[in-house]
Amino acid sequence: REAGVPYYTSMISNASLITEELVKEYFPVWNMKHIQVTLDGTKDEYERIKAYDDKNLGRFENIINNITVISKYKVSVDIRVNIDQKNIEDVHKLFNQLEKIYGDNSMVRYYPAFINGSSCDVPVESRVDVLYNILKLMKDPAKVMSVNRLYKQPLTAPCHRAQPNAFSIDAEGNVYKCEHDIGRPDNKLGDIFTGVDDEERRKNVAQLREECEKCVFSPKCYGGCESNFLKSADPCMADRYIIPAYMSVILDK
């Protein structure tokens, strides 16, 4: 900022510690444009999963209030809702609640995301139907984050993992290629104190797989999540399921 270099900031947060004072004082300094906040379900489910020591910070109502505060200062919020086979009914209830609060708030969007790599994963063949039923609950299905990106130019990389000069850094200063690698010592590239040890892995970019080259969703996905693929989980980005679900909702009207 002092050097006159243009920049902006985005954040992934649980929103528990965000206050109006913080938003007013620091967000302009950081040029904060976007925050992603995860809600794991309706009040009882959310508070059960989070289980904060400070029950007040972890209150569902506190998070909802903080999201409202953020949006009031014209910072966009994507509410990420993780979905597996066990919580689909609760997710429907959550979206009904969110629509009552944020249905007309243009600064708040939704990011329904399937959990991958667990025994409770929603089967790939069921995901479009699951999202279709969620989109039907919304006044404006275009509030779903991926739909907002439908008309943007095609991707040339799925995420920052494919960029040789992009990194994820954990709280101890360890450097990784991807946020999904954090906490896995075998995937560490180095640290911010001594530098990157594995220069070849830093530069290495996974090649687009043959099945992805032929996929109609490739321009919106470009191979998807390499971390999920390496774990034998579904690598496809949410767009792969949201786009056909959204098109079905449009055709119903």
Model regions: which residues?
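Short clusters of hydrophobic/aromatic residues that line enzyme substrate/ligand-binding pockets
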Residues: 46, 159, 189-192
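A structure-centric signal for secondary-structure junctions around beta-strands
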Residues: 6, 163, 209-212
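A C-terminal junction/extension of Radical SAM enzymes
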Residues: 76, 107-109, 113-184, 220
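A generic alpha-helix structural signal
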Residues: 67, 95, 134-135, 193
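Flexible mid-to-C-terminal extensions adjoining Fe-S/redox cofactors in radical SAM and related proteins
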Residues: 180-253
